[in-house]
Amino acid sequence: MNVHTPRKDEALTVTTGPLPASTKIFTAPEGFPGLKVPFREIALHPSAKEPPVRVYDTSGPYTDPTAQIDLERGLPRTREAWLEARGGTELYEGRDVKPEDNGNVGEKHLARAFPVRNLPRRGLPGHPVTQYEFAKAGIVTAEMAYIAERENMGRKQAAANAAHRIAEGESFGADIPEFITPEFVRDEVAAGRAIIPSNINHPELEPMIIGRNFLVKINANIGNSAVASSVAEEVDKMVWAIRWGADNVMDLSTGRNIHNTREWIIRNSPVPIGTVPIYQALEKVDGIAENLTWEVYRDTLIEQAEQGVDYFTIHAGVRLAYVPLTAKRVTGIVSRGGSIMAKWCLAHHKESFLYTHFEEICDIMRQYDVSFSLGDGLRPGSIADANDEAQFAELETLGELTQIAWAKGCQVMIEGPGHVPMHKIKVNMDKQLKHCGGAPFYTLGPLTTDIAPGYDHITSGIGAAMIGWFGCAMLCYVTPKEHLGLPDRADVKEGVITYKIAAHAADLAKGHPAAQLRDDALSRARFEFRWEDQFNLALDPERAKEFHDRTLPKEAHKVAHFCSMCGPKFCSMKITQEVRDYAESGMADMASEFRNSGGEIYLEEADAAVKASNRALGGKAAE
């Protein structure tokens, strides 16, 4: 089902409705009866004699058939009541939208502003505002209780065999509990090991957590460019990404209408939204990096914080002294934000204003509880440049900035590479933990080889699974279009599914106590030839069914005990089932014979036969 919103120049369309055999359910955490935490339950065929399989759900109201979706009004502002109850914030008029906020685009090409304007909210002096500050004060927020319920999949006690699953895994020092309590969430946030990206101006948000001791999360990038896309396409891509499992979405728009595009996305997003503010700041100075100023950047931070952006990528670790370290690289500086700041540093021959004004940036972000995503502006753009001096010099600076941000009451995660061959991945995780005090790591892949343009979702998915296993908390997806063009709707889905696989593989390897439940359910369905259950339990039910039906399209084939790979005579699972049936039949026959013979364990005739056989084999000694 699609929802349309008329526009003066285009129709805004998003996909709604449940996935196959799926039902949206809600549970409430104990002690917080007003909270409704969403999950998806996948119904199985009655022959399975199993309950529905419950899975984590990022799709928001868009897959709830009872929800009334109105893109013109945005999603319900559920967290507003939580914020009011906590106190410590105020509504205020906010800044006016300026022509430069949308790239000085003329009226003809200006995207329509979001129809509803809500007053922005900011923190009051002397009160905790950020989730980090509440956690440090020993306060369990509604967001923390919501997250505990979400990470536990609504269970009220540890999953069966939880301790065994944890013991089987290799978590490389992570501390994954059998059961997550709100107090555990609070403790992880207070220690800086996890963040809850949740701007107080994004009340439509369904809270989630990013941290090494929780489920591995994934981020999907969307956004227009100077040559492609529109508001409608980007809102559609956001809804499409979360339908398939994106936990977070970054709006990396660099073209016209940046402000209005972002407003439409945030107001209709149930997941955290991140941005790179330097992109919009650059648009405000006509794309000339040397003309950037602290004042322009500061204004951009406030603009985006008032809109509700949940985390900012800020490349404050790109220092003047580090830029020459990239001179001998094969691919130089590949981060857009990093290259912008490097050019500014060289043009002015001084430290970046992101570095020199970092404490002021912290003060702004704390007022709105915008989380830091400290950008790796000097990440390697080829495996030849992996783990070089420039990359790790910046990482050490990010560790120093993390301590400053924590002291200011802000939440922090650290961005990582990039392009790294498999044998060089683990040292990245180890160094990040060492230098950044355990703050969550968030990596782009990494891509493990450079020879596969068009398939970089695969080259990076390999690295993502590995670094997720080693302790990376969030994986930024890579699509097949990486290095080639702006991703479209199909690319977004391909990237999200690839990274859901990587994140889930990491959860399994770490020994997450409930990660294997879905795998086991699908394996049972596969062995029992419950084809529809196999499709429905898959990350992409549509593709699974499509591939099956290309060669066996009839409904009768949905109950067949074979697929087109092996056919009816060579299906290993069918043969195995026949062997089992034969063995069970044979055991039943033997049991019947035993009972018919009187139930004696030793029979005289049999005993005599055994002795005769033993004599033939080796005389009386064999007896």
Curated annotation (Swiss-Prot):
Family named by the database record: Belongs to the ThiC family.
The species this protein was found in: Parvibaculum lavamentivorans (strain DS-1 / DSM 13023 / NCIMB 13966)
GO term, biological process aspect, one: thiamine biosynthetic process
UniProt-listed Pfam families: ThiC-associated, ThiC_Rad_SAM
Subunit structure: Homodimer.
Listed InterPro entries: ThiC (IPR037509), ThiC-associated_dom (IPR025747), ThiC/Bza_core_dom (IPR038521), ThiC/BzaA/B (IPR002817)
Keywords for the protein's UniProt record, in alphabetical order: 4Fe-4S, Iron, Iron-sulfur, Lyase, Metal-binding, S-adenosyl-L-methionine, Thiamine biosynthesis, Zinc
UniProt xrefs under HAMAP family: ThiC
Enzyme class: lyase
NCBIfam families named among the record's database cross-references: PRK09284.1, PRK13352.1, thiC
GO cellular component: cytosol
Top-level division of the source organism's lineage: Bacteria
Listed name of the protein: Phosphomethylpyrimidine synthase
Binding site for Zn(2+): 419, 483
Keyword Metal-binding: yes
EC numbers: 4.1.99.17
Catalytic activity: 5-amino-1-(5-phospho-beta-D-ribosyl)imidazole + S-adenosyl-L-methionine = 4-amino-2-methyl-5-(phosphooxymethyl)pyrimidine + CO + 5'-deoxyadenosine + formate + L-methionine + 3 H(+)
Pathway it works in: Cofactor biosynthesis; thiamine diphosphate biosynthesis
Cofactor: how bound: Binds 1 [4Fe-4S] cluster per subunit. The cluster is coordinated with 3 cysteines and an exchangeable S-adenosyl-L-methionine.
Gene symbol of the encoding locus: thiC
Residues binding substrate: 221, 250, 279, 315, 335-337, 376-379, 415, 442
GO molecular function, one term: 4 iron, 4 sulfur cluster binding
Chain positions recorded as [4Fe-4S] cluster binding sites: 563, 566, 571
Gene3D superfamilies the record matches: 6.10.250.620, Radical SAM ThiC family, central domain
Function as written in the Swiss-Prot or TrEMBL entry: Catalyzes the synthesis of the hydroxymethylpyrimidine phosphate (HMP-P) moiety of thiamine from aminoimidazole ribotide (AIR) in a radical S-adenosyl-L-methionine (SAM)-dependent reaction.
Required co-factors: [4Fe-4S] cluster
